[in-house]
Amino acid sequence: MDVIQSIDLITKNTAVRGGKPCIAGTGLRVTDLVIAHLFHKRSAEELTADYELSLSQVYAALAYYYQHKDDLDKDIRHQVLNARMIKERTVSIQH
């Protein structure tokens, strides 16, 4: 009989970051690491230094992302659109 083991490194709490999946014990969203990894080309080792995390925390976040890719990709697209809107508003205010 197989026993599935869980790694308790990713949490969701409505009181932290609106219930978005975060690395346990931090307010760091899984999507924050994924964006740094995929778009800014940061390696897992670089992410450990950038965010003061263990390698197991980084790999847990990446594994969680790939297991929930569709939902988290929607969240990332939403974050990118919000960032663009904020940037456009800031630029228009400055001019």
Positions of the model-derived regions?
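Long, charge-rich, low-complexity intrinsically disordered regions
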Residues: 2-4, 9-10, 16, 38-39, ...
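Short, Lys/Arg-enriched anionic-surface-contact patches
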Residues: 8-28
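Structural motif
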Residues: 23-25, 52-55
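Short, amphipathic alpha-helical "recognition" segments used to contact nucleic acids or chromatin
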Residues: 27-41
